């Protein structure tokens, strides 16, 4: 089996190639990855908004994976990468017309999100659905070595944080467990939701890290101190205000049994955080 990953140099894309186990791998990205090169993956340099290059790139692959993030395409907007970039991928698959599998990484509880991020993701999903043989993967927050969140949570935990809202549920899923679910769901045509069953708020994550670091925990902010506590957290410059507001949403899903079906003991984010906080010998 041959796969190509758009956004392959990012966390999700890199792990897809590392963990899927395809006979041939390629990644389409502006950035070359020495890690993927060492695995024998072919680098296709390009911008996801370059229609001609994208149309040419998808040819010859059994599975086409769309895992590009806005930060992977410097200077491009979230809308450009997710919507216009996806249109190019869909055009390429339709042009090849060989029943290629399109795998798109979206976000769980998308229908509840009111921000531009979620609106754009919904539009992108609409484009994905134009390909009959598609799989939309809607995970909660994904963690693992090299993820985009854990290091910054540790940085936050090292800061003095008096209070923060006890809201939301990250329901984090380890990338290895997510890939196990995906590999067992490739025959699915449609969308799958993947979240952990153990609830964990952003404040819980910070306090787990604080405890592992030997620091005093932050207290839950009340109604009157909620807004100021969020502002103070964003002023530390570790997470943007938009990111912090996203962390206060609920990414738990009652009807997602896929993780338990295919992974008997899902990896715990609390344990992962505690281990990440320990001094490395």
What is each of the regions a protein language model found here?
Residues 70, 84-122, 130, 135:
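Conserved Rossmann-fold NAD(P)-dependent oxidoreductase catalytic core, especially the SDR/UDP-sugar
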Residues 184-240, 253-256, 260-281:
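Mid/C-terminal beta-alpha module of Rossmann-like enzyme folds, strongest
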Residues 79-83, 114-125, 147, 171-172, ...:
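Short-chain dehydrogenase/reductase
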